[in-house]
Amino acid sequence: MNEPHPHHPLPPHPAPPFLELGTHQAPKHGHPVCGDAVFRRRLRVSGRTLCVLADGLGSGVKANVLSTLTGAMALTFVSEDMDIEQAARVIMDTLPVCRERGLGYSTFTILDASPDGRLRVIEHDNPPALLLHSDGAVVPLHKQPLRVPPPADGNGEGCTLLACDVRTHENDRLILVSDGVTQAGMGRPGTPLGWGLGALHAFIRNLVTAVPTMAARDLARRVVEEAVRRDGGQPRDDTSCAVLYVRRPRRLLVVTGPPFVRENDRLLADSIVHFPGEVAICGGTTAVIAARELHRPLTADLEHLDEDLPPLAIMPGIALVCEGAITLQKLLERLERAGDPTAGPVNSVTRLAGLLLDSDIIEFVVGARVNDAHLDPSAPFELDLRRNIVRRLQNVLETRHLKETAVRYL
């Protein structure tokens, strides 16, 4: 897997829109894991954003194994530009067919989006993808059938895929769902046949009309939560949603640690003043330097206190001011494990996680000076720890959350 490149700051004004990809899932009630699998990847050289939503037959661990195998293969084949019919043939030959139902053990939808607006969707027995313009209008997707013939030895069956090539524009959204969404509420009063595509489209249209800048992960979460609600709070099937949002990139600057030489304190302040986006300051000494150089007040935030974390602070024009080492370490732990990193009480970790996930291009400015309070034999270790945490944050943000990152040392 490609490692992040921390040596050069990112250009301030990228030309292409950013492709934000957000997902949310809920397992069938009573099962520990979701039988659907969602895989996503951003290719560094081409800038393409890939996503595969696979739905394993049944629910639980068995379905998860099958959907995971399907999704992993599909993502690999698409990233290597394998012919889609050949890729589907390999997947179908690998997965068995259910003898009782005569169905493949996993369905899937593949999304391949380029920064220049080209978008390809491949569907195999999943609910149809939905493309919305910025005004909420549904864009018809004209799909072409792709026939995958049975293997030459006759041991297997063929299938028909649906393929669509379309060009997206800024503020367009593409939504993928598993049938746990469209069939939510089936058999209940008002929705005897389930939620259905039409009602789902109307729900999404109302959401993005009310909140035009809604993040992809928030829209995916709202869709899944509504599906679960329609099932009475107990999902009757694995429920998944993936959202691609084409928009202008959101930038975040994370400043942590004082500069190596005090003469660079002004450079740190200039980085904050001239940054075209939101700013988070992580570190008490760093915050004091910024407040002094920027001539801004720095006050304690007594509203969001957490006994496990140092308190927050408030500085005009800064999105978040918090402690450094402990906060960043706990943030890293949340980002590296499964689940929503923003879940839980409002504190420095959940707020910083929200800023990172809501941003697309993240630049770290890391001070190379050891805090005066820590001038002891372990001082070099403190600096190495700070650098290591930032490197690991870069890696998880790029590989798991598809962010663009850069690091600059002062």
Where do the language-model regions lie?
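Regulatory cytosolic signal-relay segments
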Residues: 1-34
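C-terminal catalytic subdomain
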Residues: 2-10, 183-270, 274-276, 296-410
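Acidic loop->beta-strand submotif enriched in PP2C/PPM serine/threonine phosphatases
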Residues: 31-46, 139-187
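Catalytic core of PPM/PP2C metal-dependent serine/threonine phosphatase domains
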Residues: 34, 66-135, 159-161, 214-244
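Primarily the active-site beta-strand->alpha-helix module of PP2C/PPM metal-dependent phosphatases
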Residues: 37-94, 175, 186-201
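Conserved beta-strand-loop-short alpha-helix elements that form
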Residues: 47-59, 123-124, 165-190, 244, ...
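Short active-site oxyanion
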Residues: 117-118, 274-279
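Conserved phosphate/anionic-ligand binding catalytic regions in large, soluble enzymes, centered on
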Residues: 234, 277-291
